[in-house]
Amino acid sequence: MTLFIDGDAFPNLLKPIVLRSIERLALPTKVIANKKINIGRSSHIEYIIVDQGADEADHRIVDLCQKDDLVITADIPLADRIISKEGHAIDHRGELYSIENIKQYLAMRNLMESIRESGEMTGGPKAFGPKDAHAFANQFNAFLAKNC
């Protein structure tokens, strides 16, 4: 299994959590972003910088991801593409996406985007905080314990 990190919006609070697991499990990891992102120093991490542009990092992740790989991303359409390749995806708040739930999350995301575009609602999700990092750590570590 390879771990992929969609680095474009990766929260700083998650970096030490993920780095500890990468080191503990000697987990091959690719951090992909359109700018330099530093998760930490590890011989198990490869940093890949893609061209600027919408979804360039997403396209590279999809190209490289294989069955049973894990992608950390807050991008639900990217998670959907990974699931369709028989990969796994987890978001920054610890939600593990699956074939059973990804379409529901995608539909909700699209609905909320439409509501925001209509002006009926502004803003996005609440700010990321320590409770979110804790939920992520629990789900991430449980996934790794089961799959590594």
Curated annotation (Swiss-Prot):
Coiled coil: none annotated. Disulfide bonds: none annotated. InterPro entries: UPF0178 (IPR003791). It holds the Pfam family DUF188. HAMAP family: UPF0178 (MF_00489). Belongs to the UPF0178 family. This is UPF0178 protein SUN_1096. It comes from Sulfurovum sp. (strain NBC37-1).
